[in-house]
Amino acid sequence: TLERRWGLKIKARGIYRDAVRSSQSHFVKCSGLRWVCLMLLSPISWANKIWALPFLTVLAPSKRYHEKQGKKHKALSDWARQICYLLHRWLPDFQLIIVGDGAYSVLELLAATRNYVTWITRFRIDAALYDFPPSEKRARPGRPPSNGKKQIALWQRLYCPLTKWQEVTFSHWYDEQNKSMEIASGIALWYRSGKPPVPIRWVLIRDPKGKLDPIPLQCTDLSLSPIQIVQHYLKRWQVEVTFEEVRAHLGVETQRQWSDLSILRTTPALMALFSVITLWADTLNSWQKLTVFQTAWYFKPYPTFSDAVASVRYRI
């Protein structure tokens, strides 16, 4: 995520695209700090929702910062690869599924970590996809082929009459309502010259009413069904909800510190505080149900994070 910050003494800040204020036809730049945040998507029974609980937050400095320091720049995918190795070291016996946006749909990242974690990300609709190489042995000399025949691109499958679409009703769409969508899926090798090929399952999602743009997804676990992949990806929206909650209630983006160490410590601590407050609220709810604070213009059937913060503050 992007923490919007200004200041000449903030060394690690950079100029990035503001995903909230930008659109396909309008590009908005913003100054700030880029953070890579790993969260646990966990169901919260008393909130009747899935919440994203941060437990590891890493600063990804800008390219300009590394150039001034005389260091090699680490891209966002490099930080993500290092985090995956650390997570696998912590939890070697767990099946780990990481859901991310299109920034993590990087061929080198998926190839380096697919033996440790399963990636589900938004995919490039113009990615070069190939069939698997033939398994039979060939008599001609040379190294065996790394890929087979090239498949048609995903954007071409949207209009191909041979594409088989399946209509599925998802009970937890982005607005928490039932939504009927059409999905198509297949298995392919994602390959670029000079890069290791990665077997993926691609999923295309389109709105039968034509109101929403098509959504391409990819998953590095070929055993997951297309419906499971879409259901996992829909949970990613809770990550954006957590970012908004920490901005509104925990003071992220309102800090005034500028030294390197204070920046490295404060924002990860505030992100982790979201998870700590949730655990405290869960303990309080086991003793007595949390109070749901209502407003005149909106009815809340279940407690939200603001109610959890209020309950914890009252107990403290």
Tell me the role of every PLM-derived stretch.
Residues 1-51, 57, 171, 185-190:
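Active-site-proximal, Lys/Arg-enriched surface segment
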Residues 5-10, 49-316:
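Single, function-defining residue in the core of a domain
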